C-alpha cells in the first residue's frame, strides 16, 4: 500500500510525468536488451510503430510499373526512395489495398487444392455445433496431441522427398520414393497442381501440413482427437468449458481409432494361440485398415496404446519407455530400484511369489480418466496424489497404486483364493492376480489401509475409505488434488524385446507391457478393418467362421486337391481349419474326424469315387485329432446360430448347399464362391483338351515329384515328365511332347490312355 501511495504522489507532480514521457532511454542495459540478437523483443510494439510510418513495406521494383503512383483519393502509394540495404522500393499499406481491389486476378482453381486443410477446417466449423458453456473447475493435463486434422502419416523425411518431387521436380538431389503412400500422394498432387501459379514455397508449406503429423504438448480436459484440438481455445478455459460436436471427421483420427481396435483384437486373439508371437506377426502382416497395410500404419503412426505398442514391439520398432499397469501409464520420474523375489502370504494364507522392487521411486501415473503422482519405498506407499474426473476414476487410480506399492496390508486384505486366468486359461502373474481381485471389490483394501489426520494444503483434500472427501482425515498417504498430473512429455523411443508370450521388456529386463494390460473394451472401427488371417475369422462369430472356412477351401481348391491325394496329414494340420473346431461339439469331434478320414481314404483307394463337393464339405471335420471307432454318420452337427445345425454327409442342407447348375456354393445362405470345375460330370473332355501336347505314359511315378495341377503343366519344358492330378482325383505320369505336329491326335488318345493308366 505504502509504495502505491508513494507512486501516486510522484505521478501527481508534473515533473515526473515529463521525465517519464520525454526523456530518451539511454540506459546501456535497456539499449542492450532491445538491440542485441536478431530476435524481436517486442513484436507487437514494433509492428505498431512500423505501420505508423508512411512506407513500412518493401516490394520488388517491378511493382512501380504495375501500380499507379496515387490512388483514386490522391494518396501516394509508393515512395521514390529505395529501401536502405536492398534494391527494393518502399510502399504504403494503401498499395496493398489497391492491389487487392484492382490487381491482376489469377485462376482460383488451385486454391481449394493447395489450402485444402483450411477449406476443410472451415467446413468442419460450419457444420459443427457449439453447446452451452459450463462454469466449473477444469482438470487439464498436458498430453501430446495431434494439432493438424486431415494429414497423412508420413515421416518428416518421407514428406520432404514428396514435397521436393512435387514442387521442384527438376531440382537435383537423391530422392527415393519407396512407400506406397509416398508414390500415391506424389502422383495425386502432381496431377492436381498442373499450371498452378501459387508460389512454390507456399505450396511446400501447405503440403507439409497435409502430409506430416504435428504434435504439441497441450493442457487438455476432454477430447484429444485432432478435430477437438483445433478448437481447443473455444471449448475450454481455466474455469469454463463449452460443449462442441465437430462438423466432420478426419481420416487421421479415424486411422488412430481403427488402429487401436485392430491391435486390441489381434493381441487378444494371438494371446490364446499356440505361438502368440508368430500369430501376432502373421495377423499384423495380413490385416488392412481402410485399405492400407496395418504394418505400414504401425511404422508411421505414433499412437501410444498398449496393444498398438505390443504390435510395434513385435515388428522390432522402438516404443515409449514408460510401462503400463492396470491401464495406467507409469513413468518413473526419480529414484531407482532393484528387483528381488519374495514369498508373501495373502489374507487367505495363499503363498504368492512377488518380484519386489527395493528402493525409493517416484512415478507419474496417467490414465484415460485419472492421473496421479506416486512416491513409494520398498513395499511401502509414501504418498499418492490423485486427480480424476469422477469418484469411480479416482477409485481405479487408488487401487492400482495400492497394488503397485506391494504393501503388506494390501496383500493381507485379500479374501478368498486368487485364481484369475487370462484368455488362454493360463494363471495370471501375482501382481495381476492382486489387481483383478481388488478391481472387483476394494472395500476391504480401503478399510485395512489405515487413516491419518491431514494438514490443510491448498488445492488438496483428504479421502476416506468410503470415498467421501474430508479436510480433517484421509487414507494414509493418499490425497486428492484439483490439479491433474501432466502426461510424460518426453517422446523418446527405446529399443525393446518381446518374448513369445508377448511380454515386452526394456534393455534392463523390466516388463513394460503384456497382454494382460490390453483394454477389453470393444468399439466399432471408423475405417474398414480387413483381417485376411484365418485366426480372425471368429471375430464376427460362428457364422463367419463357417463361411470363411469354405471360402478358403474353394479359393485354394487346386492346391488343396493335390494335398488331399498326396499328403492329407499336412492338409489336416493347416491352421485355416483351427477356428472351425470350436463349432464342432467337443464330445464328438474325434469320432467325426476319424469317420471323415476313413471315408477320404476309401475315396483315394476306390477309383471313380472322388467327389469334389463331398471333400470340400467334410474336409474341415477331418482336422481334429481322430478317434478310431466304427461309427458311421449320415449328418454332422455344427454349433451356429445358437444351436446345432446339421450338415448332411450326402446331399445339401441349409448349412452347406451346392447348386450343380450354377456351380455356386452357399453356406448358411451366404455366397461362399464358385467351383471352377464341375465335380460330378468328370472332366475327361476338358482334360483331353488340356493334355494336348502331352503324352500319357502311365500310372503315377513318385520319382517325378509331387503331382501338379493341370494349370501348372504349362511350365514344363519339352520332353520333361511330371505327375499330374486329373479331375477324378487320380494321378498319372505325362511327358510334354517334343514336336507340336502330333498334338491333334493327343486329345483322342488321351481319354483312352487316362482310362488305361488308371485301371
UniProtKB/Swiss-Prot annotation:
Keyword Protein biosynthesis: no
InterPro entries in the record: Flu_PB2_2nd, Flu_PB2_6th, Flu_PB2_C, Flu_PB2_CAP-bd, Flu_PB2_middle, Flu_PB2_N, INV_PB2, PB2_helical
Sorted UniProt keywords: Cap snatching, Eukaryotic host gene expression shutoff by virus, Eukaryotic host transcription shutoff by virus, Host gene expression shutoff by virus, Host mitochondrion, Host nucleus, Host-virus interaction, Inhibition of host innate immune response by virus, Inhibition of host MAVS by virus, Inhibition of host RLR pathway by virus, Inhibition of host RNA polymerase II by virus, mRNA capping, mRNA processing, Viral immunoevasion, Viral transcription, Virion
Superkingdom: Viruses
A Pfam family per the record: Flu_PB2_5th
A GO term for molecular function: RNA binding
Major place of residence: virion
Protein localization: Virion; Host nucleus; Host mitochondrion
UniProt site (Mammalian adaptation): 627
UniProt-listed GO biological process terms: 7-methylguanosine mRNA capping; cap snatching; DNA-templated transcription; symbiont-mediated suppression of host cytoplasmic pattern recognition receptor signaling pathway via inhibition of MAVS activity; symbiont-mediated suppression of host gene expression; symbiont-mediated suppression of host mRNA transcription via inhibition of RNA polymerase II activity; viral RNA genome replication
Stated family: Belongs to the influenza viruses PB2 family.
Subunit structure: Influenza RNA polymerase is composed of three subunits: PB1, PB2 and PA. Interacts (via N-terminus) with PB1 (via C-terminus). Interacts with nucleoprotein NP (via N-terminus). Interacts (via N-terminus) with host MAVS (via N-terminus); this interaction inhibits host innate immune response.
Protein's recorded name: Polymerase basic protein 2
Gene: PB2
